[in-house]
Amino acid sequence: MPSVMWKELTAEDLRAKAAANAIVILPVASMEQHGPHLPVGVDTFLCEAVCKAGAELAVKDVPVVVAPTLWCGMAEHHMAFGGTFTFDIPTYMAVLRAFLTSIKRHGFTKVFIVNGHGGNIAALNAFLPDLTRESGLTLYATTYFELSKADLAQFLEDQKSVHHACEVETSMMMVVAPDTVKRDRLPEAYGMLNGDPRKAYPAARYLPFKDNLTATGVIGDARRANANKGEKLLKVCAEGLAAALKNKEMWA
């Protein structure tokens, strides 16, 4: 099967993809601390892996290509730990606008922004109306683990959903980039299990992770992670994305 990855195709291949009215998946992620046991590139590794696997499942039924991953996002709340890059709001929107403009100029009309970092969600939701109006593209934005939230829950032991450097992300990294996981640091890789209870309040507030939420950089419990679980989690995430790509009503 030919590659679904933009970076592995020729310009001629990509002109053919545009002529076939392919959906462009644009992975957006982050480069930020992920506790003592995981590399800072977790969100980028996992988002790209899910996008690739989902596209490979869908490409038999719908033309699709995975654009290069935008590896920097909104990560101010992790800066105190070190190892983190972050955009401010105007820069993030400007970069996304430039990416979408390039995609449109090559003849593509449908773009699926697939996010892999919780800190990007609010910004993407806020940007979407303007980016859609300005670009004229059929444009969706999602977060890959939200697409499969109900299916992920069956594999989790203590957590209710995906958190940070947690059971889910650590298990998936044991599959996607196993050599980057420091297994000897797993005994200390845990924090509050189900996120900040203050999020239940009907008001918004900004809280940096280090001084307010976790001393380890972890929310959840990475001690529950294993590669077998990671395979299952990766599979359901890919299937959730593939289902969205193949949804004819979405892309009509």
Locate each region found by the language model.
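Conserved SAM-binding loop
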Residues: I113
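Extended, histidine- and acidic-residue-enriched regions that form the cofactor-binding/catalytic faces
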Residues: M1-K110, G118-A252
